[in-house]
């Protein structure tokens, strides 16, 4: 069999952890890593049931692949247990050796609403998964990633920071802060590369309720009107941004946009 060549084999033999990998874009990243030759793929989410289901789907969809698949639960939703949960996750993954890439796509409910209605505790909670968890994960990377420019940490964020909407003050604060975090971590963790993917509307399981209630066409019609592509993003397209950041050893401290042209409209 002919060699795949240097342009499509950059992830061959790599070990990839996807935090938030049981569904949506995270699942897509895990599958893409498998199809790009990763030797071991680890996925994590808060639900063991979802992890088991995801691993079965990955095996079914990629029967000819040789990658080893592993899954470990990790609940990022509580500030009180966040550090211990992340430490336990990396302790489990470390039993198989060091990683080459960590991808963070975990998320939770967006704290959108009238600012005065949020307590300080609620404001803090709003950033636990999307802001504080990536920082806590970053604390583990020197120990558990190969310290070289081939290694990377990629974090999902939203493309919404460029458009100011009413009642989004809390989320804008965290989403904007995450972009600064990426630049700081790129310096602090060097030579490990740190980047982010800013995602626009993407058709994932998070929209299931909207589809079930019959609102999908109305909601997406409004969104499409703000997108120069005129199409809601597909997981297989958005995932290409993550592959680019894992493969490109010349990129660190960057935010790659995959928003369907939303930022231009």
Curated annotation (Swiss-Prot):
Q: Which residues are glycosylated?
A: 62, 218, 250
Q: Which InterPro entries match?
A: NAD(P)-bd_dom_sf (IPR036291), SDR_fam (IPR002347), SDR_superfamily_enzyme (IPR051122)
Which Gene3D superfamilies does the protein's record reference?
Answer: NAD(P)-binding Rossmann-like Domain (3.40.50.720)
Give a yes or no for keyword DNA damage in this entry: no
Disulfide bond residue pairs: none
> Which effects follow disruption of this gene?
Does nor affect the production of the fusarubins.
Q: Which UniProt keywords apply?
A: Glycoprotein, NADP, Oxidoreductase, Signal
Q: Which residues cross the membrane?
A: none
Query: What do we know about what induces or represses this protein's expression?
Result: Expression is induced in presence of sodium nitrate, and repressed by glutamine.
Position of the signal peptide: 1-32
Q: What does this protein do?
A: Short-chain dehydrogenase/reductase; part of the gene cluster that mediates the biosynthesis of fusarubins, highly pigmented naphthoquinones responsible for the coloration of the fruiting bodies. The non-reducing polyketide synthase FSR1 is responsible for the condensation of seven acetyl-CoA units to yield a haptaketide. After rings A and B are formed by aldol-type cyclization, the PKS-derived product is released as 6-O-demethylfusarubinaldehyde.
User: Protein name, please?
Assistant: Short-chain dehydrogenase/reductase fsr5
């Amino acid at each position: 069999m002919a060699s795949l060549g240097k342009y499509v084999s950059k992830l061959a033999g790599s070990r990839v952890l996807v935090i938030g990998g049981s569904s949506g874009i995270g699942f897509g990243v895990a599958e893409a890593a498998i199809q790009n030759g990763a030797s071991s793929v680890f996925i994590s989410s808060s639900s063991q049931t979802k992890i088991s289901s995801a691993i079965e789907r990955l095996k079914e969809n990629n029967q000819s692949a040789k990658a080893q698949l592993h899954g470990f639960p990790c609940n990022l939703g509580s500030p009180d247990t966040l550090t211990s949960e992340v430490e336990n996750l990396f302790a489990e993954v470390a039993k198989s050796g060091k990683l080459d890439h960590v991808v963070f796509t975990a998320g939770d409910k967006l704290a959108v609403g009238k600012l005065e209605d949020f307590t300080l505790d609620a404001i803090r909670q709003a950033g636990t998964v999307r802001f504080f968890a990536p920082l806590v994960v970053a604390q583990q990377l020197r120990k558990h990633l190969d310290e070289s420019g081939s290694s990377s940490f990629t974090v999902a964020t939203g493309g919404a920071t460029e458009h100011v909407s009413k009642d989004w003050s809390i989320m804008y604060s965290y989403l904007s802060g995450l972009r600064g975090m990426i630049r700081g971590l790129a310096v602090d963790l060097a030579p490990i590369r740190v980047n982010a993917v800013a995602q626009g509307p993407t058709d994932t399981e998070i929209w299931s309720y909207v589809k079930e209630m019959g609102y999908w066409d109305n909601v997406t019609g409004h969104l499409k009107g703000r997108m120069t592509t005129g199409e809601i993003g597909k997981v297989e397209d958005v995932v290409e941004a993550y592959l680019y950041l894992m493969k490109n050893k010349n990129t660190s401290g960057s935010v790659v946009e995959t928003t369907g042209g939303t930022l231009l409209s």
